[in-house]
């Protein structure tokens, strides 16, 4: 008799077939949200390849996605931790601590010897992506690191940087900041491995000490060499600090085991438990019921539980497509547009994309380029200016930058202005729509809502520390389903129904997506639901705007996320459901709006008559740079001790800094990043005195309103003071 152990996880399906105590078949594959289909495929294979027979052999299931599948096959469901513990007990009787990291969950098990055997203490994290495989993979995709390279990237010997370990979304933001400051991707990945181990040891040990021997299970622990190195470093350090007695003659590193079968321990545990069950329990009943569920059952259930689709019918899609085409047609520059003199260039170095536009002296758009960030701001700048030059624009009369990378690149490129993002986006919107009431800019990792009064920004809402409602989250989900971003809308519009996703935090939204795919919702249906929930997160969760009617009638949608047709359809429907007579308009250059706003600001510089500081195309193309982040770059001007990065760029005429702790030769200029205040931009006392003088000047020129309000709140009125004085 054969026993099948199958683990249906959040990202993969794994299975083993055991006969007479030996594994005769095993495999694991990603299911891309089609859990039932992948399980059916595995069952078909074990029947043909391993000789499994329905009605004779037995099957046991575990994993987050096995709950509804197991009964359809006649299988019994076993809790994941119980299954893992059973296999560890049999295969590694000396192990006292287990860490299993999965795609979207992680668990730790402490084994303690007792008089009658072993006691087990279990801690799990399943509602947050922090410290899981997805935590690492999402950030690696953002950095455009292939899986094969990621698996071999090291931890040892590299400088580490602060990366949030509590949340995968915050970790992406931290990684993005490090990229924009020029930190090598190798150091960022090593820092991610550090964060994963820290999250496990800080959160899932609950103060207990992982005693040797230690067993590391799950795909991330098996495939990522750097993660194994991080585990060994921290565990050996912990044992030394807590004076844990280690077995004599054993290398401490050998006490941390990563077995070759680390993926299959839950499956093997199912088999171990199944051997002790009565013979009539969990007999495999074949694939017929599962096939019925795939073909009919799941659709019946989804029809009852789901909401309407993004598109209510062919006429709805046709009408919206006509409006979409009208908006997009306005974005086509006239073919005969030519530069007749110096041009204005605006660049927006965002979190996920880099954009550049060229305007004529009369503010006509002549050229634009838009590309996903390569992960390095200087390389992004070189690529953009290469395209500008190839388009024939050599005479630059003004250059302005905006976005996350503006501070780093302003001096390097010789930009005339660095424009705050809200100013750039408001300028771009008002240039095309002077009667706008609200501007909604949804970018890669932030959301900006600007409320206008008489052509000026009266209020704004900014959401930059959460994934709720931003484009990077949509891109991450599309990547997970192996759907090119350009096909997102087409696939989402194919859905005939969609689940109701929870509003709010991106981490919980991710968990909700996993829950919906367990119920059988397809990738297309989940992508449609994600587009539908985005406006709710943008306006209500991020913007805290419950009454859209109160902020105006004309809404301008811009930002790269609004290049997604499905997102715009959801936005239009949501806004008009709240403001029936709303005029919702897509900015003709939604992705390039920030760059256009910067270029328009450069026009004001041009009017002043001063020559541009632009360093020239040849200088930018030939840029050579190095980045340094180590003990000598840590800021010492206050107790926070920011970990700064020194980005040294080779530029003609630069003075260098021979006196620095990190010496800089003549012909090189230093850009400092990673600081949290202006003091972090300087290295010596003389520079600090100049910074302090400027800060004091600002204090004198602009009163501290908060301090004035505080003093006034606690000051008795003159009348009250007089009464008290008379009484005395």
Positions of PLM-derived features:
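Short glycine-rich, Thr/Ser-proximal phosphate-binding strand/loop in the N-terminal lobe
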Residues: 3-45, 118-122, 126, 347-387, ...
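Glycine-rich phosphate-binding loop plus the immediately following alpha-helix
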Residues: 34, 113, 118-159, 263-266, ...
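Glycine-rich phosphate-binding loops at beta-strand->alpha-helix junctions
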Residues: 64-65, 206-239, 243, 259-266, ...
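Conserved phosphate-binding/catalytic loops in two-lobed NTP-binding clefts
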Residues: 77-81, 232-268, 416-423, 574-596
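Glycine-rich phosphate-binding/hydrolytic loop that grips phosphoryl groups
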Residues: 133-138, 245, 256-299, 427, ...
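Adenine-nucleotide phosphate-binding core of ATP-dependent small-molecule kinases
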Residues: 173-202, 511-541
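Phosphate/ATP-binding catalytic cores across multiple sugar-kinase/actin-like superfamilies
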Residues: 191-212, 322-334, 529-551
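Acidic, glycine/GT-rich loop-and beta-edge segments that sit at the periphery of enzyme/chaperone cores
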Residues: 269, 273-342, 448, 601-692
């Amino acid at each position: 008799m054969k026993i099948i152990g199958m683990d249906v996880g959040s990202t993969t399906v794994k299975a083993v077939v055991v006969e007479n105590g030996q594994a005769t078949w095993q495999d694991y594959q990603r299911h891309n949200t089609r859990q039932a289909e992948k399980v059916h495929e595995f069952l078909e294979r074990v029947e043909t390849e391993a000789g499994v027979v329905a009605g004779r052999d037995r099957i046991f299931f575990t994993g987050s996605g096995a709950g509804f599948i197991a009964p359809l096959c006649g299988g019994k469901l076993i809790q994941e931790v119980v299954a893992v513990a059973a296999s560890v007990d049999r295969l590694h009787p000396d192990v006292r601590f287990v860490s299993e990291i999965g795609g979207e969950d992680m668990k730790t098990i402490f084994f303690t010897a007792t008089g009658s055997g072993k006691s087990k203490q279990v801690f799990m994290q399943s509602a947050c992506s922090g410290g899981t495989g997805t935590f690492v993979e999402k950030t690696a995709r953002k950095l455009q690191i292939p899986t094969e390279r990621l698996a071999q990237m090291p931890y040892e010997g590299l400088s580490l940087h602060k990366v949030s370990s509590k949340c995968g979304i915050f970790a992406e933001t931290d990684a993005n900041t490090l990229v924009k400051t020029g930190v090598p991707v190798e150091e960022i990945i090593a820092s991610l491995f550090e964060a994963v181990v820290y999250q496990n040891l800080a959160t899932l040990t609950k103060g207990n000490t992982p005693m040797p021997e230690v067993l590391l299970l799950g795909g991330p622990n098996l495939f990522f060499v750097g993660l194994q190195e991080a585990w060994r470093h921290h565990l050996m350090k912990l044992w030394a600090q807590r004076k844990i007695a280690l077995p004599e003659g054993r290398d401490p590193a050998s006490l941390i085991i990563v077995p070759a079968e680390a993926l299959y321990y839950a499956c093997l545990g199912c088999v171990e438990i199944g051997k002790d069950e009565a013979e009539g329990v969990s007999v495999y009943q074949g694939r017929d019921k599962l096939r019925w569920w795939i073909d009919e059952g799941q659709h019946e259930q989804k029809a009852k539980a789901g909401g309407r689709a993004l598109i209510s019918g062919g006429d709805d899609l046709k009408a919206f497509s006509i409006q979409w085409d009208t908006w997009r047609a306005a974005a086509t520059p006239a073919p005969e547009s030519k530069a007749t003199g110096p041009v204005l260039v605006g660049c927006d170095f965002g979190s996920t994309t880099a954009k550049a536009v060229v305007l004529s002296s009369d503010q006509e758009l002549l050229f634009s380029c838009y590309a996903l960030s390569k992960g390095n701001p200087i390389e992004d700048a070189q690529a953009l200016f290469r395209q500008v030059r190839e388009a024939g624009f050599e005479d630059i009369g003004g250059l302005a930058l905006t976005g996350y990378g503006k501070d780093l690149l302003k001096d390097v490129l010789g930009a005339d202005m660095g424009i705050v993002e809200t100013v750039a986006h408001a300028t771009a919107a008002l240039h095309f729509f002077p009667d706008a009431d609200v501007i909604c800019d949804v970018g890669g990792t932030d959301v900006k809502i600007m409320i206008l009064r008489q052509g000026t920004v009266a209020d704004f809402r900014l959401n930059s520390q959460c994934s709720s409602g931003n484009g990077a989250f949509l891109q991450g989900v599309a990547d997970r389903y192996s759907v090119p971003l350009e096909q997102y809308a087409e696939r989402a519009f194919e859905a005939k129904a969609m689940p109701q996703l929870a509003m709010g935090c991106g981490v919980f939204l991710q968990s909700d997506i996993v829950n919906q795919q367990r119920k059988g919702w397809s990738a297309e249906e989940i992508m449609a639901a994600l587009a539908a929930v985005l406006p709710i997160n943008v306006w209500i969760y991020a913007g805290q705007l419950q009454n859209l009617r109160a902020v105006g009638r004309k809404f301008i949608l811009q930002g790269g996320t609004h290049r997604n047709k499905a997102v715009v359809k959801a936005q239009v429907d949501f806004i008009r459901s709240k403001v029936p007579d709303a005029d919702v308009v897509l900015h003709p250059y939604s992705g390039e709006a920030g760059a256009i706003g910067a270029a328009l600001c450069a026009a004001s510089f041009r009017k002043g008559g001063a020559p541009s500081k632009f360093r020239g195309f040849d200088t930018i193309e030939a840029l050579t740079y190095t980045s340094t982040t180590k003990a000598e770059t840590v800021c010492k001007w206050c107790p926070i001790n920011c970990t700064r990065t020194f980005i040294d760029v080779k530029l003609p005429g630069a003075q260098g800094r021979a006196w620095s702790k990190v010496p800089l030769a003549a012909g090189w200029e230093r850009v400092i990043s990673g600081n949290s205040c202006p003091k972090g931009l300087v290295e010596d006392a003389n520079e600090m005195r100049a910074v302090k003088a400027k800060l004091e000047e600002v204090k004198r020129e602009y009163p501290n309103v908060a301090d004035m309000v505080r003093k006034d709140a606690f000051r008795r009125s003159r009348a009250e003071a007089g009464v008290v004085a008379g009484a005395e």
